[in-house]
Amino acid sequence: MAGPVSLRELLMGASAWTSSESPEGSPTEGGGSAAGGPEPPWREDEICVVGIFGKTALRLNSEKFSLVNTVCDRQVFPLFRHQDPGDSGAGIRTEAGAVGEAGGAGDPGAGAGAGAGAGAGDPVRGGVTAAEGNRTEPGSQDYSLLQAYYNQESKVLYLLLTSICDNSQLLRACRALQSGEAGGGLSLPHAEAHEFWKHQEKVQCLSLLYLFSVCHILLLVHPTCSFDITYDRVFRALDGLRQKVLPLLKTAIKDCPVGKDWKLNCRPCPPRLLFLFQLNGALKVEPPRNQDPAHPDKPKKHSPKRRLQHALEDQIYRIFRKSRVLTNQSINCLFTVPANQAFVYIVPGSQEEDPVGMLLDQLKSHCTVKDPESLLVPAPLSGSRRYQVMRQHSRQQLSFHTDTSSSSSSGQLVDFTLREFLWQHVELVLSKKGFDDSVGRNPQPSHFELPTYQKWISAASKLYEVAIDGKEEDPASPTGELTSKILSSIKVLEGFLDIDTKFSENRCQKALPMAHSAYQSNLPHNYTMTVHKNQLAQALRVYSQHARGPAFHKYAMQLHEDCYKFWSNGHQLCEERSLTDQHCVHKFHSLPKSGEKPEADRNPPVLYHNSRARSTGACNCGRKQAPRDDPFDIKAANYDFYQLLEEKCCGKLDHINFPVFEPSTPDPAPAKNESSPAPPDADADKLKEKEPQTQGESTSLSLALSLGQSTDSLGTYPADPQAGGDNPEVHGQGEVKTEKRPNLVDRQASTVEYLPGMLHSNCPKGLLPKFSSWSLVKLGPAKSYNFHTGLDQQGFIPGTNYLMPWDIVIRTRAEDEGDLDTNSWPAPNKAVPGKRSAVVMGRGRRRDDIARAFVGFEYEDSRGRRFMCSGPDKVMKVMGSGPKESALKALNSDMPLYILSSSQGRGLKPHYAQLMRLFVVVPDAPLQIILTPQVRPGPPPCPVFYPEKQEITLPPDGLWVLRFPYAYVTERGPCFPPKENVQLMSYKVLRGVLKAVTQ
């Protein structure tokens, strides 16, 4: 054979000339490429097949390649190899990558090696192995390479397996994991990386199964002098896999021209396994210091290496016998070992190899003039002779290069060389004696067959198709069907190879019940997603304390699924929260549709939300209280409850109705918030710019007027034409006319789309809700409020039901002009000029310059307790006949939307009261009181809420009540009430809620 080729190319080339040959055709002499072309001259040779596998160390050249070079006594594999094209590491040399060639193109002996391969298209030429044909793409994750070399002189076919156990392939696999090629561009987690390595072990086992099915002799190469106990597990796995797939292999070779026993056992004979160990440098025996290395003493009977060899043989045999890999009858074993022959060979140790130094030393030896004879031009050396010269002149020996002398460097006797060790077994094959390795009282002879090259190719091709190459075949084809069955049988390897996963699964399975118990501890019957996640986190902590290994993630996911199934199977609490931030107490259910009745027996039940929380609230005007359920939607919170009380209490009172959506189509749609809302800070600045100045800032009060001297008399004034009692808005129909431009919302209200929530500063312009969350009711005329007794309504805490006075200075036209005609009639309620008023106020001011309004900010808690506040965080307390404080402080401040209730319960949680109503007594005077409520129910970026009409002019002579919304909701969800340790001033009613404009 020209040189080593991939086994795939060898079998495909042989199949090509086998299928094209004629009955009279004769073999073509002169050799040729083994991968195709003319048929080889050795097709009728009876061959011995030797398989080589094992592990390699961190060396520049593989021990397997050096072994073949040594046994064949020629350079079959080059000493240096070009770097693997698929290898990205330019600075690391492996057996699949090197920097040059061994030998020269003009070397005659290389005609059967590297030199001849160049002309025949040999892929070994140039250092790139022919195993590239068997190499797959990185994504396929196959790092097993099979190479073949046939030595025609010795009639031995060498099969070399390079797998994940070799340094070069291990390096490629690690780089694929590091770069993400094995994970589709992503780094693999621990469990998937473990699966990757176990997959490579299974692929290696398939290649080993193939070698054990087609070889007579197998060489196990190991880079140390100690036996790797993991091979016992691998061989037991291979034996189990072989017994599993034996019927499939029989089917594959049933038509091959081989013997009956071969077809029955799917192998030419039970292969004999030999072991080659590399002696460590630490165990190398050096000669005594006073002894001349050139003249050693007489060697002892048993050298240390021989004793180590015997010890390894005994150890290996005992291990395999105990694990029943070896039995008395060799025909039933995966392999055999000889009973009366050495099956362990120890390669003498050497220092770390340096092929570059070896070549430099060889160059020196050729260039140094030693004697006159060396001046003569030497004759060209043959390939074999050239190889011997390289060995003799090398400064350091390669891994398996052994001297042919009978003495080692330590003076100990070495019985045979590596070639002699191997050839004693090869000769048994070539002489057709076979292996008689059965032991016991009744040993049964094992079958043996020495095939010709052509017959071996026929059987090996079929096995290669179904065991290795058939992974890419169509599963419907016969070959693909057999391969799929073989691959499905690989699961038998898991019990032998994946011990880590097996232990990990047992460990994780024991940890699962403990994690389940931790999850279910202290659980209510129904609970929410938050409780589920907290309990699951506790269960995972318990699980992580006991679970280990690659199955950790798998059973952690199972724990997730088990806990979720437990929760969703009748233990799932409704996730809906009320507008007061309380959970629905029902288990998972659906809401009744329009006209559908609740059904608790259905699965899931059809029920309305219910948090079992009830509170007491007053109606729009505040005169009647009633219990209310915890609301879950904005309509029930701000409209339905008050509409029910309207029929019993407030229905006959005068209202100022806010504009709402009036559809022009039968099926109006809710609007989508497509407009970009203005920044909250900008809105706040604009609103503050629009905040009106109260009377205390625009006009000065009389210094002579004191709260103690004030009276209830507000005087009688003519009705203002713009705010007279005949204004239709007083009766709830029209709008109060003001000098300001109407709002954009009022001008461009849509009749097609409605606002699904409440009106606030981030809403799209031109949209109105279907109902108003605000209410403005007139309780009666101004005189219906008694300053001394306060409001006569239910639920007020004693001493807190008073309105604060708000004194407003009114300048009449006569006083401003100062020169009235004495002949003209005085204005109503005015004195005749020239006469002083009966009551003289301080500084000579007239009493009729002052008008008094009353303002009250009412807070209400969930238990129906009501009270007024005279300022931020200040509950009103009136002990006498009326409040002493003015309303100016409250009107010029941001009033809190929530305040601590004056009557806290026994619980530790604080109890809050909410601003629900604003009472305003408008005097019958020539002035206008404009109402502009603006509420921010949370810290920024919470928007500002306001009614559908931002500025409302209150008609004179009335006791008006503005009812604030019970809940505030945006498109993103409700604005929940404050919790503990929250700044209450972030929830506020902006100052400027009232302003007075004099006529």
From Swiss-Prot:
Post-translational modification Phosphoserine, affected residues: S477, S676, S750, S903
BP-aspect Gene Ontology terms: nuclear-transcribed mRNA catabolic process, nonsense-mediated decay; regulation of protein kinase activity
Modified residues (Omega-N-methylarginine): R906
Pfam families listed in its UniProt record: Smg8_Smg9
Domain of life according to the entry: Eukaryota
Keyword RNA-binding carried by entry: no
Record's comment on post-translational modification: Phosphorylated by SMG1.
Record field: compositional bias (Basic and acidic residues): 287-297, 683-692
Biased composition annotated in UniProt, kind: Basic residues: 298-307
Composition-biased stretches (Polar residues): 693-714
Residue spans of biased composition, Low complexity class: 18-27
Start-end of Gly residues biased regions: 100-120
Region described as Disordered: spans on this chain: 15-42, 83-136, 287-307, 661-734
InterPro entries listed in its UniProt record: SMG8-like
Signal peptide region: none
Keyword terms, alphabetized: Methylation, Nonsense-mediated mRNA decay, Phosphoprotein
Function: Involved in nonsense-mediated decay (NMD) of mRNAs containing premature stop codons. Is recruited by release factors to stalled ribosomes together with SMG1 and SMG9 (forming the SMG1C protein kinase complex) and, in the SMG1C complex, is required to mediate the recruitment of SMG1 to the ribosome:SURF complex and to suppress SMG1 kinase activity until the ribosome:SURF complex locates the exon junction complex (EJC). Acts as a regulator of kinase activity.
UniProt subunit comment: Component of the SMG1C complex composed of SMG1, SMG8 and SMG9; the recruitment of SMG8 to SMG1 N-terminus induces a large conformational change in the SMG1 C-terminal head domain containing the catalytic domain. Forms heterodimers with SMG9; this assembly form may represent a SMG1C intermediate form.
Family: Belongs to the SMG8 family.
Protein name as catalogued: Nonsense-mediated mRNA decay factor SMG8
Species name: Bos taurus
Native organism taxonomy: Eukaryota, Metazoa, Chordata, Craniata, Vertebrata
